[in-house]
Amino acid sequence: QAPTDADLLSVLIEDAQAGHDPRVVLALHTAPVDLDPFSEEAIRAANPAFGDFQNAAETLAMAEDARRMPSREPEYRNLILNQRVDMNAPFVSQRVWQECGAPVVDDFRGLPVFGGLDLSEVSDLTALVLVAPVDGVWHVKPTFWLPGQGLADKARADRVPYDLWARDGWLQTAPGRTVDYEYVAAHLRDLCETHDVRKIGFDRWNWRHLKPWLAKVGFADDQLEGDAAIFEQMGQGFESMSPALRDLESALLNKRIAHGRHPVLESCARNATVQTDSAGNRKLSKSKSHGRIDGMVALAMAMSAAGTWEGAAVIDHMAMIG
């Protein structure tokens, strides 16, 4: 079926079910909503060819993936169970997220480092997430910034304990009412001087504001743009984010992520849902208006940047052979 009630196919099915035109015969194979959606019974109800020319093992594997990863469940229900469903879903289940909560190594120096930078408006949460490979697992090290002035008020407005996170060192506060791009640029300069930073993906929307500050703190032109640039622009729409989410999702499902249960990043993971377009491409969106997902957007960009590294294929192979 089509995903929503407004789709033409949905309208045609409902018209046929109502019997308005006696010349139309409807044969609809769909899994009843009261069945376990991941059971073989539900699959067989929607797929008369299951086990015949429809590969049973592949279909059952899709069911298991959808059970473990909520972001895949709407597509599974729509395409395999032939159900009409809301195509927005949580990106990652708490169980899968917690399974990847192993401690993170203290120091990324000496390792190839990749990053994702989600630049906010100057008064909102800004996130830089770094990933580095350690024994076949991508270790995750996030940094979050908010303006220090008015932090308690923002915590009340967003219903998020920013002030407590800042007190405990999980959140960095910038002086004043804004997180100035100069402040972020200086942090990136220090990072690149002390670490082997290969690539940092970032939202192209605010590049025009950040680029002058990066040049001012000492980044060369060829580090900012061109084939050898450290910084790589990434769009935030369906076309750009869908491959990045696929890489991140694969790493989470195969336990090739170690995030250390960072509370700010974990809050972003809980807030992140997946929005799907008509072509099946996906991007992250917020589950509620006051929730923040900046850390997950930055993590997805970091994993996308890491995919350009020649050693990433070795990690993928290690996951396949288990």
Regions found by a protein language model. Give the residues of each.
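An acidic- and aromatic-residue-enriched active-site/binding cleft used to recognize and process polar
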Residues: 1, 31-32, 118-122, 133, ...
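Non-catalytic, compositionally simple segments
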Residues: 1-114, 123-125, 139-183
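A short acidic (Asp/Glu
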Residues: 2-8, 124-127, 208-216, 242-246
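Metal-dependent DNA phosphodiester-chemistry modules and their immediately adjacent helices/loops
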Residues: 15-45, 157-169, 213, 217, ...
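Acidic, metal-ligating active-site segments
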Residues: 122-136, 293-297, 301-303
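Short, surface-exposed connector motifs at secondary-structure boundaries
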Residues: 190-199, 227-230
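Short glycine-rich phosphate-binding loop at a beta-alpha junction
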Residues: 194-211
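Acidic, low-complexity intrinsically disordered tails
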Residues: 312-322
